[in-house]
Amino acid sequence: MKKIQMITPIVEMDGDEMTRILWKMIKDELILPFVDLKTEYYDLGLVNRDNTGDQVTIDSANAAKKYGVAVKCATITPNAKRMTEYKLHQMWKSPNGTIRSMMDGTVFRTPITIPSIHPAVKFWKKPITIARHAYGDVYKSIDIKVDEPGVAKLIFEGESGKREEQVVHTFKGPGVLQGMHNTDASIRSFAHACFKYALDLKQSIWFATKDTISKKYDGRFREIFEEVFEEYKDRFAAAGIEYFYTLIDDAVARVMRSEGGFIWACKNYDGDVMSDMVSTAFGSLAMMTSVLVSPDGKYEYEAAHGTVTRHYYKYLAGEETSTNPIATIFAWSGAFRKRGEMDSIPELMNYADQLEAACFDTLNEGIVTKDLANLMEGVTPVVKNSADFIAAIRSRLEKRLS
């Protein structure tokens, strides 16, 4: 079989633990036999991030901005335990957070659904896409642990000399405080990305904050969304879709009673939480796509889940693992499809379609990893380990491409 040729490289960001093992399996079994793969490789494994002072993360984000399409493996965001385990020089920030910030992107996460796995929420008939603002708020916050009485103040000193000062709290004893921010430019980019994506998918978009409580902070999000929507209003009407704003608590109640089939735009923290809730309710976090989209049309694809640490320790102990690779495979297929679209390579786009179809063929025949076995209805599942599951996908992919 002649391999599909590429023109422009995809930026490849390798990762950590069990997903790093799956990454190599996927490349060896599902990509390299069919595609003359061109990537610009960056090792974002925690050891290399530590060795490079996290410069590799910055370099990979710049490469994504240069080439326009990236695919990323799941990575560890270190905590105190990981500091000790990996003997780190410092507690490095989330690589996802760094990349999102540098690309000023919006994260869109959509469940991968199959007929035999029914959502836990009985009303849901169609996938719900979470649009997560990927900049600022608590992820760019500053924390202080207070150990004595005192006054906490919020101060802004403008370049013009203007000064604003407000008392946050007068502490009578120990406590904690936090300062966070966002920018009009980033919120505006988020709004544009959401409305453009809604038009691409021809789906309505819901947006929710808590502007009744956070009148200036969350209120600014609402104001900017309403301003930006004026530019899209006519196109939304022509497409038969709508923009709907409500409070975040009301949005949760409405989402739980809905049929799905829309985009739910969320602030950074809300999107982080709700994407996990939506993916789990639809079946599994291992069955969810994630794509970071920048305002100037750069894309970074990844799985929505983490590094699957528990399975990795089993793997290191020589035990068999049944880790679900679907979301990671779909990260690659998404990157190939977008690269093919940008470079006008229909063969690469078709390969991406057939790779995803081969995954669905495998799952619909009841061949699954352990996490999906108890979720399936109407099909007798046959549980495979990771390697055998990927091999089953390969055999179906070969048939589709022959």
Predicted regions and their residues:
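Flexible, glycine/charged-enriched surface loops at secondary-structure junctions
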Residues: 35-41, 201-209, 233-245, 340-352, ...
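N-terminal small/polar loop signature for handling phosphorylated ligands or for N-terminal nucleophile
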Residues: 46-60, 222-262, 266
